[in-house]
Amino acid sequence: MEAKAIARHIRVTPMKARRVVNLVRGLQANEALAILKFAPQAASEPVFKVVQSAISNARVLADRDGVAFDEGDLIISEAFVDEGPTMKRFQPRAQGRAFQIKKRTSHITVVVATPEKEEAR
């Protein structure tokens, strides 16, 4: 079973968000939440929320399909950050000049899945 959550237009730079996402990729979902809760990076909060949302989505899918659900079985199978639209702002400078400031945004995607049981042959 696979469940997905996407947060779009998050006001954090993709490079900083990728640093946090790389910490939790491949881990169990509960372990990832524990790491994100105490991570010092500001990007850990939106990633935490997306992981929580993916777990909730998995719970809803399991209830809908009538499958037994155990949160401890979920692993983060995919996690990636794409670049969102960039907001362009201007900072006034001396002698009538202006410097451009790029406020970058991110699209954070997390997919949680239950590990496939190997069939006995």
UniProtKB/Swiss-Prot annotation:
Matching SUPFAM superfamilies: Ribosomal protein L22
KW Ribosomal protein (keyword) present: yes
Question: An example Gene Ontology cellular component term from the record?
Answer: cytosolic large ribosomal subunit
Q: Which CDD domains does the UniProt entry name for this protein?
A: Ribosomal_L22
| One Pfam family cited in the UniProt record for this chain | Ribosomal_L22
Its keywords, alphabetically, are: Ribonucleoprotein, Ribosomal protein, RNA-binding, rRNA-binding
UniProt keyword RNA-binding, yes or no: yes
Q: Any idea which GO molecular function terms this record carries?
A: rRNA binding; structural constituent of ribosome
Among InterPro entries, the record links this protein to: Ribosomal_uL22, Ribosomal_uL22_bac/chlpt-type, Ribosomal_uL22_bac/org-type, Ribosomal_uL22_CS, Ribosomal_uL22_sf
Give the PANTHER family listed for this entry: CHLOROPLAST 50S RIBOSOMAL PROTEIN L22-RELATED, LARGE RIBOSOMAL SUBUNIT PROTEIN UL22M
Oligomeric and partner information: Part of the 50S ribosomal subunit.
Q: Which NCBIfam families match?
A: rplV_bact (TIGR01044)
What is this protein identified as? Large ribosomal subunit protein uL22
Q: Which gene encodes it?
A: rplV
